């Protein structure tokens, strides 16, 4: 697909600002923020985040405030209606997803399961 669309996976301002900072530190304006789902964690599935300078043909690309978020079609089905956020606190800093589709999460919040 590899086209820019409006999609029900949102980014908070906090996530956008952190992504922009990290891309600037890498000095590569072509980087995009990839969100994906993998098997693993104590609840069966877990979120992954990485930077990627290529968009695969089947990827969905979502642009917001100059940040391009990319998601593969398999991961996308688990992320519908989700919100990508970023927080900094005493326990460290991290990207995370608020996902309305999740049935259960592990205590650390990095893995989840769905029905």
UniProtKB/Swiss-Prot annotation:
<feature type="binding site">
    <location>
        <position position="108"/>
    </location>
    <ligand>
        <name>iron-sulfur cluster</name>
    </ligand>
</feature>
<dbReference type="GO" id="GO:0005829">
    <property type="term" value="C:cytosol"/>
</dbReference>
<dbReference type="GO" id="GO:0051537">
    <property type="term" value="F:2 iron, 2 sulfur cluster binding"/>
</dbReference>
<dbReference type="GO" id="GO:0016226">
    <property type="term" value="P:iron-sulfur cluster assembly"/>
</dbReference>
<dbReference type="InterPro" id="IPR023063">
    <property type="entry name" value="FeS_cluster_insertion_RrpA"/>
</dbReference>
<comment type="subunit">
    <text>Homodimer.</text>
</comment>
<protein>
    <recommendedName>
        <fullName>Iron-sulfur cluster insertion protein ErpA</fullName>
    </recommendedName>
</protein>
<dbReference type="InterPro" id="IPR035903">
    <property type="entry name" value="HesB-like_dom_sf"/>
</dbReference>
<dbReference type="InterPro" id="IPR017870">
    <property type="entry name" value="FeS_cluster_insertion_CS"/>
</dbReference>
<dbReference type="GO" id="GO:0051539">
    <property type="term" value="F:4 iron, 4 sulfur cluster binding"/>
</dbReference>
<dbReference type="InterPro" id="IPR016092">
    <property type="entry name" value="FeS_cluster_insertion"/>
</dbReference>
<keyword id="KW-0411">Iron-sulfur</keyword>
<comment type="function">
    <text>Required for insertion of 4Fe-4S clusters for at least IspG.</text>
</comment>
<dbReference type="Pfam" id="PF01521">
    <property type="entry name" value="Fe-S_biosyn"/>
</dbReference>
<dbReference type="InterPro" id="IPR000361">
    <property type="entry name" value="FeS_biogenesis"/>
</dbReference>
<comment type="similarity">
    <text>Belongs to the HesB/IscA family.</text>
</comment>
<keyword id="KW-0408">Iron</keyword>
<dbReference type="GO" id="GO:0005506">
    <property type="term" value="F:iron ion binding"/>
</dbReference>
<feature type="binding site">
    <location>
        <position position="106"/>
    </location>
    <ligand>
        <name>iron-sulfur cluster</name>
    </ligand>
</feature>
<feature type="binding site">
    <location>
        <position position="42"/>
    </location>
    <ligand>
        <name>iron-sulfur cluster</name>
    </ligand>
</feature>
<keyword id="KW-0479">Metal-binding</keyword>
